[in-house]
C-alpha cells in the first residue's frame, strides 16, 4: 500500500484538504505584496535640482533638457545675469542642495534621494531583497529536511512579520536593505514549505487544481497591492501594512499538520499515526483512522523507511543520468522564468502608463493565464504546457524590439501577454518540479530550482543597464534566454496522472519505462516492414 492509498482511506479530498489548502493559500496574498512592493515604495517621481537658497524659484533659473523640462541632475552655477562674463552664463553643476520632487507619494527614493548619481541604489535595494530569497532557498530547504516542514513554515511567517515591520522603521537605506534581505530569506522558507505541504496532502487527481488555487492567491495579491498603495502613500506605513498580517498567519499555521512523508522518513511513526487519525476524524472517516496502526504504516511504507536511512544531499541531484537531466532542464526553465518575469513586472514605470492601472492590468492577466495553464497541465500535460509558455513569452519579448516607443499601447499589450505567459510558467514549474523530484530529494530540488529563479531575478536589473549601449540589447537577452528555457522543458518526463516518486530508484524505473514505451512502437513498426521482391512471378 502506497501513501496515496493510505491518504484515500482517511479522506483524500475532504474538508481537511479544503481547509489545509486555504490556510496555505491566504499568506500568498502577502507574498505577492512583498515581491512587488518596490514598484510603489521605490517609485522615482519627476524631479529637478533645488535652487540655491538665495535663488529665484522661477523655471528659468534651472537649465532645460532636450524635452524642454528642467534638467533632473544639473543646475546653473550662477543665476542668469547679463553682467556676468559670457563663458560663465551657461555653466552648470550637480544638485548641491538636493532635489524637488513633483509627487505627493513618499518613497525611499524621495526620502534618501536615490536619484542621479545614486539612482543605482534603488535597483540595488531590490537586488538585495532577491539575494535574500536566493540565500533562503538552500538554507530553509536544509532546515526543512532536518526539522520538518511545519516548524519552518511557522518561523518563516514570524521572520517575515518581524523583519518586514522593522524595515518600516529603518533610519537609513543600509538598515532598510538588511531587513529587506531577511524578508527575502523568509519568503523562500514560506514558498518551499507551502509547495511541499500542498502536494503531499492533496491527491494526485486534484494536485493541479490546488496548486493553481494557491497561484491565484498570488494574483489576487497583485490586485490588492495597487489599491493599498493608493490608499497609503507613505512608504513606511505601506511597508508595515503588508508585513503585520504575517503575525496572524504564524498563529494560524499551528493548525497545519506536518508532512506525513517527512514524519515517516524521520522515524516518527506515532506522531504520523496521530496526524492521520486527526485528518480521518476531520474528514468524517474516524473509523478508518482508528483501524490504522503503527505496524501497518511501517509495513506499507517500508521502502520509504529503508531509503530514508541513506542521507541525500546536493550531489545526489547529479548522481544518475535522469536526475542530472531533470536538474539541468528545470534549472534553465526556472532561471529563464525568473529572469524574464521580473524584468517585466518591475518595469511598470517604463511603459509611460499610470502605475496603479498598469499594475492592476499586470495582475489581471494572471487570471486567464493561470486558468488556461490549469486546463493545459490537466489535459495536455506539464511538459508541453511548460515548453510553450516560455516560448510564447520569449516571442513576445523579442517582438518588443520591433515596436517603437511611441506605440505605447502595442508595447504594453506585448508586455502584458509576456507577463501572463511567465506567470503561467511559474504556476506550472512549482507543480512540475515537485512531481519530478523524489521525496528524498524533493525539498533539495525545490531549493536549487528556487535559487536559479532568484539568480535570474537578480541579474535582470543588471541586464537592463546594457540598454545604455543599445536599447534593443536587453530584450534580445531576455527573449533568447526565455526561448532556451522553453526548449529545455521538452526534454523532461511527463508527470500527468502519475504518483509522486518516493526514491531515486522510482524515478529511474519511471525513466526506463518511458524509454521502453517509446521503443516498442518503433520495434513493432520495423517488424511489420516487408521487403519488396525484385524477381518476377
Swiss-Prot record:
Glycan attachment points: 81
UniProt keyword annotations, A-Z: Cell membrane, Detoxification, Glycoprotein, Ion transport, Lipid transport, Membrane, Phosphoprotein, Transmembrane, Transmembrane helix, Transport
Regulation: Expression inhibited by androgens such as testosterone.
Source organism superkingdom: Eukaryota
GO molecular-function term, one example from the UniProt record: organic anion transmembrane transporter activity
Nucleotidyltransferase found in the keyword field: no
Modified residue annotations for Phosphoserine: 4
Residues in compartment: Extracellular: 33-123, 172-176, 234-236, 349-354, 405-411, 493-537
Annotated catalysed reactions: estrone 3-sulfate(out) + glutarate(in) = estrone 3-sulfate(in) + glutarate(out); estrone 3-sulfate(in) + 2-oxoglutarate(out) = estrone 3-sulfate(out) + 2-oxoglutarate(in); taurocholate(out) + glutarate(in) = taurocholate(in) + glutarate(out); dehydroepiandrosterone 3-sulfate(out) + glutarate(in) = dehydroepiandrosterone 3-sulfate(in) + glutarate(out)
Phenotypic consequence of gene deletion: Mice appear healthy and are fertile. Exhibit a loss of taurocholate, estrone sulfate and para-aminohippurate transport in kidney and of fluorescein (FL) transport in choroid plexus.
Primary subcellular site in the record, as a coarse category: membrane
SUPFAM superfamilies listed in its UniProt record: MFS general substrate transporter
GO CC annotations on file: apical plasma membrane; basolateral plasma membrane
Region described as Disordered: spans on this chain: 513-537
Bilayer disposition of the protein: Multi-pass membrane protein
Assigned protein family: Belongs to the major facilitator (TC 2.A.1) superfamily. Organic cation transporter (TC 2.A.1.19) family.
Protein name: Organic anion transporter 3
Organism: Mus musculus
Encoding gene (name): Slc22a8
Amino acid at each position: 500500500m502506497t501513501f496515496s492509498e493510505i491518504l484515500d482511506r482517511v479522506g483524500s479530498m475532504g474538508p481537511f484538504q479544503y481547509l489545509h489548502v486555504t490556510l496555505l493559500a491566504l499568506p500568498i496574498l502577502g507574498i505577492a505584496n512583498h515581491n512587488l512592493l518596490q514598484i510603489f515604495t521605490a517609485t522615482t517621481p519627476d524631479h529637478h535640482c533645488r535652487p540655491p537658497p538665495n535663488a529665484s524659484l522661477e523655471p528659468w533659473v534651472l537649465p532645460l533638457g532636450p524635452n524642454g523640462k528642467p534638467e533632473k541632475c544639473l543646475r546653473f552655477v550662477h543665476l542668469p545675469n547679463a553682467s556676468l562674463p559670457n563663458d560663465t552664463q551657461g555653466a552648470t553643476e550637480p544638485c548641491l542642495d538636493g532635489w524637488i520632487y513633483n509627487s505627493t507619494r513618499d518613497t525611499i527614493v524621495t526620502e534618501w534621494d536615490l536619484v542621479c548619481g545614486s539612482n543605482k541604489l534603488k535597483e540595488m535595494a531590490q537586488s538585495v531583497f532577491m539575494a535574500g530569497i536566493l540565500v533562503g532557498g538552500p538554507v530553509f530547504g536544509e532546515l526543512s529536511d532536518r526539522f520538518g516542514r511545519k516548524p519552518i513554515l511557522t518561523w518563516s511567517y514570524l521572520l517575515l512579520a518581524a523583519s518586514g515591520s522593522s524595515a518600516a522603521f529603518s533610519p537609513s537605506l543600509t538598515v532598510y536593505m538588511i531587513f529587506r534581505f531577511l524578508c527575502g530569506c523568509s519568503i523562500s522558507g514560506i514558498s518551499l514549505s507551502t509547495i511541499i505541504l500542498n502536494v503531499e496532502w492533496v491527491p494526485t487527481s486534484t494536485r493541479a487544481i490546488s496548486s493553481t488555487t494557491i497561484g491565484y492567491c498570488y494574483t489576487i495579491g497583485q490586485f490588492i497591492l495597487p489599491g493599498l498603495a493608493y490608499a497609503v502613500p507613505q512608504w513606511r506605513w505601506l511597508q508595515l501594512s503588508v508585513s503585520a498580517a504575517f503575525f496572524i498567519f504564524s498563529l494560524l499555521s499551528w493548525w497545519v499538520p506536518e508532512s506525513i512523508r517527512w514524519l515517516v522518513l524521520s522515524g516518527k511513526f506515532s506522531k504520523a499515526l496521530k496526524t492521520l487519525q486527526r485528518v480521518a476524524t476531520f474528514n468524517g472517516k474516524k473509523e478508518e483512522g482508528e483501524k490504522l496502526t503503527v505496524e501497518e504504516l511501517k509495513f506499507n511504507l517500508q521502502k520509504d523507511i529503508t531509503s530514508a536511512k541513506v542521507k541525500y544531499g546536493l550531489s545526489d541531484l547529479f548522481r544518475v543520468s535522469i536526475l542530472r537531466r531533470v536538474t539541468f532542464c528545470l534549472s534553465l526553465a526556472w532561471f529563464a522564468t525568473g529572469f524574464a518575469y521580473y524584468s517585466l513586472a518591475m518595469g511598470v514605470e517604463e511603459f509611460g502608463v499610470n502605475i496603479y492601472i498598469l499594475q492592476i492590468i499586470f495582475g489581471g492577466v494572471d487570471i486567464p493565464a493561470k486558468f488556461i495553464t490549469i486546463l493545459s497541465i490537466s489535459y495536455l500535460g506539464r511538459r508541453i504546457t511548460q515548453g510553450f509558455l516560455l516560448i510564447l513569452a520569449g516571442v513576445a519579448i523579442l517582438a518588443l524590439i520591433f515596436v517603437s516607443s511611441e506605440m505605447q499601447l502595442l508595447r504594453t499589450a506585448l508586455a502584458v501577454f509576456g507577463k501572463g505567459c511567465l506567470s503561467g510558467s511559474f504556476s506550472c514549474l512549482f507543480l512540475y518540479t515537485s512531481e519530478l523530484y523524489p521525496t528524498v530529494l524533493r525539498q533539495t530540488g525545490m531549493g536549487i530550482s528556487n535559487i536559479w529563479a532568484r539568480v535570474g531575478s537578480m541579474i535582470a536589473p543588471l541586464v537592463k543597464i546594457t540598454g545604455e549601449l543599445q536599447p534593443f540589447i536587453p530584450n534580445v537577452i531576455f527573449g533568447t534566454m526565455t526561448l532556451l528555457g522553453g526548449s529545455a522543458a521538452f526534454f523532461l518526463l511527463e508527470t500527468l496522472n502519475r504518483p509522486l516518486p518516493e526514491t531515486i530508484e522510482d524515478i529511474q524505473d519511471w525513466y526506463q519505462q518511458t524509454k521502453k514505451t517509446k521503443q516498442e512502437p518503433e520495434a513493432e513498426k520495423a517488424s511489420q516492414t516487408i521487403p519488396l521482391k525484385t524477381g518476377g512471378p
